[in-house]
Regions:
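An N-terminally biased module of ancient metal coordination in phosphate/nucleic-acid-related enzymes
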Residues: 1-87, 104
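H/E-rich (His + Asp/Glu) clusters that bind or coordinate divalent metals
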Residues: 48, 204-291
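Active-site gating/metal-coordination segments in enzymes
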Residues: 71-185, 231-238
């Protein structure tokens, strides 16, 4: 792993902040936009960690954040941050029974989140969902167009909710992580179920991480043309900066201008109290911040 020397303003040497930036100090040079920023995609959890995140978000002009917060933490976050935070429905990823946690229990949670004011329901369908399915005894258990997901989408539709989904992953992951095509398929294979879901359910959809394909603006252009209920978010900042930065500036500007109103801003900011603790991490998100 590349290790860079800490910047002079670094708070501490931290592998999750390889440039050693003091983000509060960096915010002082951020331009005033004249309007508030809405972050449509974040994961704000942890009583301590969220208290660190909130002033930094405000310093950069973020006035509202839509967060995939654990159901059990929603009351605390709402009490603490009020109208500055809204919630996106997620399953219990720590549930020991994948089939139940992403199936029947998720139906219950969708309704409970909705009662708490959530307007968006998330369907996580990165290729790793196949591993979850195999663990539960059914490779296609969490397929986006499978019976379990369709039942959940029907519920979301009845409740008047928007759907968000994570489909595919970076090209680099398919070159290094998902090399078993018999198991994971090709990257493009993951878009057929998405297209079927978009055609079947007409509510607005948000495909996270620029639809999982910032590497190919032409593909995204055709996807948006074909599905008028589809929107994309810009979350997963490092991925977006790396891949969108490869395109000529005029192509990016042209794409964003053409699809103004259907591209929404998101960061994929993750906060969890695990980040503040030494030692092994229980969750994947906790581990990512220290790797």
């Amino acid at each position: 792993m590349l290790r860079l020397p800490p910047a002079p303003t670094a708070l501490r040497d931290d592998p999750s902040n390889r440039l050693g930036l003091d983000f509060a100090a960096e915010a002082t040079g951020f331009p005033s936009l004249g309007f508030g920023i809405v972050d449509i995609h974040a994961h704000i959890n942890g009583a301590e960690a969220s208290s660190i995140w909130a002033p930094i978000a405000r310093a950069y002009g973020v006035e509202k954040t839509f967060s995939m917060t654990r159901l059990e933490d929603v009351p605390l976050m709402r009490e603490r941050f009020g109208d500055a935070i809204e919630f996106i429905t997620i399953p219990d990823f720590m549930h020991p029974d994948r089939r139940h946690g992403h199936g029947t229990d998720y139906l219950v949670r969708i309704e409970r989140y909705r009662e708490l004011g959530a307007r968006i329901v998330k369907f996580w369908n990165a290729p790793r969902f196949i591993d979850f399915g195999i663990e539960a005894g059914d490779k296609d258990l969490l397929a986006l167009d499978g019976p379990m997901r369709v039942e959940q989408m029907r519920l979301a539709e009845r409740l008047g909710m928007i759907c968000m989904t994570h489909v595919a992953d970076p090209d680099t992951w398919f070159q290094a992580k998902y090399t078993d095509t018999a198991k994971y398929g090709r990257k493009l294979d993951h878009y057929a179920p998405l297209r079927r879901a978009l055609d079947r359910f007409g509510m607005p959809w948000i495909a996270a991480h620029m639809g999982g394909f910032p590497e190919d603006l032409g593909f995204l252009d055709r996807l948006l043309e074909a599905h008028p209920n589809l929107h994309l978010d810009t979350s997963a900042t490092k991925w977006m900066v790396r891949e969108l930065g490869r395109h000529p500036r005029d192509e990016i500007v042209s794409f964003l201008t053409k699809w103004r109103g259907r591209i929404v801003f998101g960061t994929d900011t993750v906060t969890t109290d695990e980040h503040l603790r030494e030692g092994d991490k229980l969750s994947e998100m906790g581990r990512k911040a220290t790797s």
